């Protein structure tokens, strides 16, 4: 794992970021934990996924060239399995959220402004659209066609629950943050501000720090 890998920003060669394999795996781990603990679907990290898959292929090729009986082979096998687990868990977490919140995710992607990063990879977008079509077809064939005419339509945006952005999450601060406004827990309390030092850990409502997760200033744990 000595080579460096290029990770571009939204496909622009000018914004290419060169990472060591260790830095790439750290990015995958952070993306995995953020996705695992965030209540909503986060920005797609498809380029990280592609680079990690490329790195896994490179590591496996190195294993085939290694001498039989070399103790390092066992450690490399363990590292490959660890990376595979993080990668598959990351993709599985995203797929489960797409299945659970698909109408809201598609609506958000549809209304995404120009220049905003996509929350779905092309493959995920195709899956979400197909999942929505299949859900509508199933509802019509199994239930809606047996209903009175005025009840034969369903608004999936209203029927499918939204992600609970008010759920609480644990986080670790990567970049110092000042005057973060925290919403009150009860009507008797008032809004207040907190400062978060680098390395500090907090339990806080996700909605409050969602922009900080997106920017990479904090990471979920």
Swiss-Prot record:
CDD domains to which the protein is assigned, alphabetical: GINS_A_Sld5, GINS_B_Sld5
Top-level lineage group: Eukaryota
UniProt keyword annotations, A-Z: Chromosome, Cytoplasm, DNA replication, Nucleus
GO cellular component entries: CMG complex; cytoplasm; GINS complex; nucleus
GO molecular function terms noted in the UniProt entry: chromatin binding
Residues forming coiled coils: none
InterPro entries given in the database record: GINS_A, GINS_bundle-like_dom_sf, GINS_Sld5, SLD5_C, Sld5_GINS_A
Protein name per UniProt: DNA replication complex GINS protein SLD5
Location relative to the cell: Nucleus; Chromosome; Cytoplasm
Protein source organism: Xenopus laevis (African clawed frog)
Subunit structure: Component of the GINS complex which is a heterotetramer of gins1/psf1, gins2/psf2, gins3/psf3 and gins4/sld5. Component of the CMG helicase complex, composed of the mcm2-7 complex, the GINS complex and cdc45.
Protein family membership: Belongs to the GINS4/SLD5 family.
GO biological process: DNA replication; DNA-templated DNA replication; double-strand break repair via break-induced replication
Pfam families: Sld5 (PF05916), SLD5_C (PF16922)
Role summary: Required for initiation of chromosomal DNA replication. Core component of CDC45-MCM-GINS (CMG) helicase, the molecular machine that unwinds template DNA during replication, and around which the replisome is built.
Lineage of the species this protein comes from: Eukaryota, Metazoa, Chordata, Craniata, Vertebrata
């Amino acid at each position: 794992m000595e080579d460096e890998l290029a990770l571009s920003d939204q496909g622009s060669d000018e914004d290419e970021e060169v990472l060591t394999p260790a830095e790439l795996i750290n990015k995958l781990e952070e993306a995995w934990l953020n996705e695992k603990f965030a209540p909503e679907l986060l920005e797609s990290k498809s380029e990280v996924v592609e680079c990690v898959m490329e790195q896994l292929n490179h590591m496996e090729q190195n294993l085939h060239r290694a001498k039989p009986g070399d103790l390092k082979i066992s450690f490399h096998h363990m590292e490959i399995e660890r990376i595979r687990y993080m990668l598959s868990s990351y993709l599985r977490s995203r797929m489960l959220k797409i299945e659970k919140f698909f109408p809201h995710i598609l609506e958000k992607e549809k209304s995404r402004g120009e220049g905003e990063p996509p929350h779905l990879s092309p493959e995920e977008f195709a899956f979400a659209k197909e999942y929505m079509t299949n859900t509508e077809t199933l509802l019509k064939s199994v239930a809606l066609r047996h209903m009175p005419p005025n009840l034969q339509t369903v608004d999936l945006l209203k029927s499918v629950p939204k992600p609970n952005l008010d759920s609480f999450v644990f986080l670790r601060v990567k970049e110092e943050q000042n005057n973060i406004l925290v919403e009150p827990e009860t009507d008797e309390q008032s809004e207040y501000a907190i400062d978060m030092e680098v390395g500090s850990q907090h339990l806080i409502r996700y909605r409050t720090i969602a922009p900080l997760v997106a920017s990479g200033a904090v990471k979920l744990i």
